[in-house]
Amino acid sequence: MVKTSILIIFFSIIMSAPANNIKQLNVDTTSGATNVVSTSAGKETVTDNELIAKGAKVEKLADGFRFTEGPAVDKKGNVYFTDQPNNRILIWSVKDEKLSVFHENCGRANGLYFDKKGNLLSCSDMDNEIWKFDMDGNHVVLISDFEGKKMNGPNDLWVHPNGGIYFTDPLYKRDYWTRDPKMQQDGEYVYYLSPDYKKVMRVDSEIEKPNGIIGSPDGKHLYVADIKASKTYVYDIQPDATLTNKKLFTNMGSDGVTIDSQGNLYLTGRGVTVFNPKGEKIAHIPVEAGWTANVCFGGKDMKTLFITASENLYSIRMNVKGTR
């Protein structure tokens, strides 16, 4: 997830919606408003591929945000995502295809992920913490420091089947920080938070700038994108949550990462690039927006790929299912 303070200067600034927990956003066609749309994404086309539904196109679902990030799917297939500079989390309902606000003043949430109990976890960048939201919008702070020092800025996260949380902690200096903007830890690392939220440990300290992160559904492998080094790594996850057997998966970094039921990995940046479990490129989904930040599968059948890109939310129908 790239430094939004640089990217958002290219995007139009919009006013945040009024604060309440969950409410419907009004569809407004005036300049700068958040709009729900249903048009194809420009002239972008997708090369025929067995992963992608026949004739499918990238569709723009909504626009007018400042910078979209962190899509995550709930048990019903609804997709939650962040409008990070506007400090809010939104919901795209798959039932009625409408947009609503889940939470405002969400700690500048970035990466999101649901735990097995249906709580929404967020990398809340305002104070460099990880938050847990219940579905009423109440939150608790799960972590804010390591060994007595503030985190640099938790960026993205994945929940292991055992309930533990793997997360990345790069440094992207934010203009809204009141803290010292210098590096808080002695590097930009990957961490693990135990299922009871009591133990935190570094699991990879030999990485330049970890960003996107995802694990295999069986909990045996972890994938971490090093966006600075333009590499993505795969690790074996041990019973004690440590990582071993680190290998280069592909020579491409990524802002966000997701995985499908066949084990294919979806990396972002300039559109969405898909790699098979061997690390071989097998598809590319172009997106008209200048920067594609993150992706997740959603929908009732988990066969829709949702894409957060710049000031927009997109989707495309797939032949493969995502995983939770």
Task: Annotate each language-model stretch with its function.
Residues 1-2:
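N-terminal secretory signal peptides that target proteins for export/translocation
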Residues 5-16:
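Bacterial N-terminal signal peptides
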Residues 18-324:
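Sequence-structural signature of mature extracellular/luminal beta-sheet repeat domains
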